[in-house]
């Protein structure tokens, strides 16, 4: 089984320069690939795949335009992966899975430096450092987090990323299967919401962390820092004395706050999933939420985005697979909140403001807990 381990690293100044150059080259190549295919389409020519583009780039374009030979200075596997990402983006567009690919803007896009194990000396890992192709040995902040080479583990591939002035490495490692599910245990249903983050059919409720005092304080601070950054840009447009270095410092402050808030939410999701999986249910049933549709509601979009429902589903799927637990996804149109768990009657006139489910049979329960109970016993589902 392949598992990804992500942790912060402490590269030297020389290594930071290489990371910046490689990530910048990957961003340039990705945008170049999109622009070239867009030009081919406008000229009525055939779409160019990633492999054909690399051949054309190395044998036709670069010899003709030697001023772009700096592209070859970057780690070749990272550049190749950037082109592959561009091809994947086009395939998703052609299959009507996403919108037309957008260009990646400097400083605003999540571009990563990909690496892969090519020879035995590459991608070695020790307790306090990891060997990355084109960078060499890099210090790890959390010592012992990534399984080491001495323990018999091998890094297959990975990537280096930057966020808010910090550097991270994500390593893909093959580990033995560790299935802990007990078939004798009962399955559970999980209802996700905005009032509370997750309501489990076993009676456990996980609160909405965005309502905590800590996050509210950070969000207020973020608003102040964003307002300060906006004023600096306004002063620059008016021609007043505002140095660009101060703008960059303020941008970094805003990025760090965004990163801190995001880390708190992600950490809460990880701990919630770990606690759910520790109960060792035979299966877990969740609902197929239409998150993109929910985001179209201007009154709820911010609250929906801050809950990170999609990330919860992806991580729950990975954790369930790791522990041998079957993850079931109920049909998108299954009315889990409107069905009486006691008699099965569908209450069609149930409003979003009705927080308590009351049925004519006398059954009274919290609507979210009632939905979790219904999800636990749903018969129509698909395996995630």
Predicted regions, residues:
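Acidic carboxylate diad motif detector
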Residues: 52-166
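Gly/serine-rich nucleotide phosphate-binding loop at the start of the catalytic core
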Residues: 1-79
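Stable alpha-helical structural segments in soluble proteins, enriched in small hydrophobic residues
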Residues: 33, 78, 82-93, 367-379, ...
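Positively charged, helix-rich recognition surfaces that bind polyanionic ligands
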Residues: 3, 148-151, 163-384
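Ordered, soluble secondary-structure elements with a strong preference for glycine-centered loop motifs
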Residues: 13, 17-20, 77-80, 200, ...
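Long, hydrophobic, amphipathic alpha-helical segments used as structural scaffolds
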Residues: 34-41, 90, 94-101, 175
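Beta-strand secondary-structure signal
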Residues: 6-8, 85, 129, 168-170, ...
């Amino acid at each position: 089984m392949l598992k990804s381990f992500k942790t912060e690293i402490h590269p030297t100044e020389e290594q930071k320069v290489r990371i910046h150059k490689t990530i910048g080259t990957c961003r340039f190549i990705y945008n170049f690939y999109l622009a070239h295919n867009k030009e081919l389409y406008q000229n009525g020519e055939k779409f160019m795949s990633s492999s054909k583009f690399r051949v054309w780039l190395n044998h036709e374009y670069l010899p003709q335009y030697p001023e772009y030979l700096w592209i070859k200075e970057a780690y070749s596997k990272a550049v190749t992966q950037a082109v592959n990402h561009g091809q994947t983006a086009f395939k998703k567009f052609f299959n009507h899975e996403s919108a037309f690919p957008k260009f990646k803007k400097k400083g605003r896009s999540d571009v990563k430096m990909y690496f892969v194990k090519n020879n035995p000396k590459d991608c070695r890992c020790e307790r306090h450092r990891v060997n990355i192709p084109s960078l060499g040995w890099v210090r790890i902040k959390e010592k012992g987090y990534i399984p080491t080479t001495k323990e018999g583990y091998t890094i297959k591939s990975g990537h280096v990323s930057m966020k808010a002035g910090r550097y991270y490495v994500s390593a893909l490692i093959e580990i033995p299967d560790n299935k802990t599910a007990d078939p004798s245990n009962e399955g559970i249903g999980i209802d996700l919401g905005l009032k509370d983050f997750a309501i489990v059919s076993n009676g456990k409720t996980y609160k909405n962390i965005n309502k905590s005092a800590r996050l509210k304080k950070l969000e207020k601070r973020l608003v102040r820092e964003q307002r300060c950054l906006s004023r600096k840009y306004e002063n620059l447009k008016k021609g007043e004395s505002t140095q660009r270095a101060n703008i960059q410092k303020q941008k970094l402050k805003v990025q760090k706050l965004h990163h801190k808030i995001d880390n708190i939410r992600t950490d809460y999701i990880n701990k919630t999933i770990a606690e759910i999986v520790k109960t060792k249910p035979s299966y877990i049933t969740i609902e197929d939420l239409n998150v993109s549709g929910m985001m179209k509601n201007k009154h709820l979009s911010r609250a929906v985005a801050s809950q990170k429902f999609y990330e919860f589903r992806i991580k729950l799927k990975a954790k369930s697979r790791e522990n041998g637990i079957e993850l079931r996804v109920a049909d998108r149109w299954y009315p889990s909140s409107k069905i009486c768990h006691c008699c099965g009657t569908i209450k069609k006139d149930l409003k979003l403001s009705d927080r308590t489910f009351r049925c004519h049979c006398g059954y009274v329960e919290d609507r979210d807990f009632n939905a979790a109970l219904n999800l636990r016993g749903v018969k129509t589902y698909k395996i995630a």
